[in-house]
Amino acid sequence: MVATAEGEPGLTDALARLAGSGRADMPDLELLPGSYDLPGARLLDVVEVMDRIRLACPWSARRTHHDLVKYGVEEMYELVDAIEAGDRGELREELGDVLLQVVFHARIAQDDADEPFAIDDVAGTLVTKLVHRHPHVFGDDVAETAADVEAHWRRRKAEEKHERTSVTEGVPLGQPALALAAKLASRARAAGIAVRPEECGTGVGYRLLEMAVGAEADGVDPESALRAAAHVYRDAIRAAEG
């Protein structure tokens, strides 16, 4: 058995000596292709398949980043559903669909005439970010608790984003409203900035904003809390329908 990509020098040397001796017939050899793939090896297959699809599929060849936005949002919501349902098979499939969005966008970016980049650039940026934000894993810093890890993360992230002029920069405004409110509140609280929602305006929107800000301060994700409550509400409606 040849267990490595480099082969087995002992085996090949012995066969060479046997073949050159002229004193014995060579044994019959049967080639049985096999592989030992490292974790992540099939990601290379994903990249290769996506590349072929981009080149050969008329629909995929015409897609742009903007075209895929709605699909990316849908896939993330479907992933959330799979997680909350606890369905392992669905979770595996939906993770694959989210991965497709990443690979598809990277392949589209590769064709950009002005600022092209490829999947390796995406992965390289991610690796650099993860290593930099985990000095307790890849450096000499110490983190004995989850709070220590969060402190390292915030400090390193602040170093990376030192050019920002506001704590609100980088917060995606297109996310669901409750999640947006919670994220803004989290940024403000971390920076020691106190802005009360009722100081911003009146009406239903500001009352909802106040509740979201309060939930974030209490360590509750308002988006998840409302989604869970909405599920219960849905079940109650179904029960009332008889």
Curated annotation (Swiss-Prot):
InterPro entries: MazG-like_dom, NTP-PPase_MazG-like_N, NTP_PyrPHydrolase_MazG. SUPFAM superfamilies: all-alpha NTP pyrophosphatases. It comes from the Bacteria. One of its GO terms (biological process) is UTP catabolic process. Pfam families: MazG. Gene3D superfamilies: MazG-like. One of its GO terms (molecular function) is nucleoside triphosphate diphosphatase activity. To E.coli MazG and to plasmid pIP1100 erythromycin esterase. This is Uncharacterized 26.1 kDa protein in blaB 3'region.
